[in-house]
């Protein structure tokens, strides 16, 4: 499975994370303004507006923290590392010879720890941010790649960003706002309701040890 996917075209640089967050934050504010201006609001719009202040404040805090993050400053300008771009369990295959990764369409030079953050967020959302699951993931990362305090702080910062909330608002505004599926409403409620559990998990993450493979 080593040749499951061979990239033929040149790999493009990922959009800088700070620029991406700036764009997301502007989009969230724009969608909120649109919803607020509507006279007749749907259940989705009312609920999204109710959750907005907390999520937007968090998004702005993350942007500020990231601009001062040491790990990001050290790695954001490097292009020698390649990110998968969509590293989750759907793109992993368990074979007789070990674990294989597939689907490299989004691969690009970038901060490699973002793959870990993406994978961890997907798993933790499915498990309602259970601390025990997070400990297993973090220990597995430390055992395989080594870990440092700077990496842990970067990971916490990335996981803090309300990316799922932004995604739902973005889908809403791009769907011409004419019809919101029940599935979207369920996802929005889940994101808002899980925020307390997510906060507790992120607080607990700050106490995680760096394992035996500690890096400087």
What is each of the regions a protein language model found here?
Residues 1-5:
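Short, small-residue-biased leader/transition segments that mark boundaries at the very start
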Residues 8-82, 184:
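ATP-dependent phospho-/nucleotidyl transfer catalytic cores
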Residues 29, 165-216:
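ATP/Mg2+ or Mg2+-diphosphate-binding catalytic cores
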Residues 90-116:
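Catalytic activation segment of kinase domains across protein kinase-like and atypical kinase folds
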Residues 113-146, 159-179:
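Active-site activation/catalytic loop segments of kinase-like enzymes and analogous catalytic loops
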Residues 147-151:
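Helix N-cap / loop-to-helix initiation motif
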């Amino acid at each position: 499975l080593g040749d499951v996917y061979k990239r033929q075209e040149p790999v493009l640089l990922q959009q800088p994370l700070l620029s991406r967050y700036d764009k997301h934050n502007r989009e969230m504010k724009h969608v909120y303004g649109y919803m607020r201006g509507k006279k007749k609001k749907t259940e989705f719009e009312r609920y999204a507006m109710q959750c907005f202040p907390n999520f937007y404040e968090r998004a702005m805090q993350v942007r500020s923290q990231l601009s001062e993050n040491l790990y990001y400053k050290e790695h954001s300008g490097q292009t020698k590392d390649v990110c998968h771009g969509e590293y989750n369990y759907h793109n992993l295959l368990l074979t007789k010879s070990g674990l294989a990764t597939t689907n490299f369409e989004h691969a690009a030079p970038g901060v490699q720890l973002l793959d870990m953050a993406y994978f961890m967020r997907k798993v933790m959302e499915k498990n309602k941010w259970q601390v025990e699951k997070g400990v297993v993931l973090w220990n597995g990362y430390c055992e395989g790649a080594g870990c440092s305090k700077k990496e842990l702080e970067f990971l916490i910062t990335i996981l803090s960003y309300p990316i799922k909330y932004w995604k739902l608002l973005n889908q809403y505004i791009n769907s011409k706002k004419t019809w919101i599926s029940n599935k979207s409403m369920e996802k929005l409620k889940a994101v808002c309701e899980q925020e307390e559990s997510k906060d507790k998990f992120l607080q607990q993450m700050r106490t995680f040890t760096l394992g035996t493979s500690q890096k400087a």
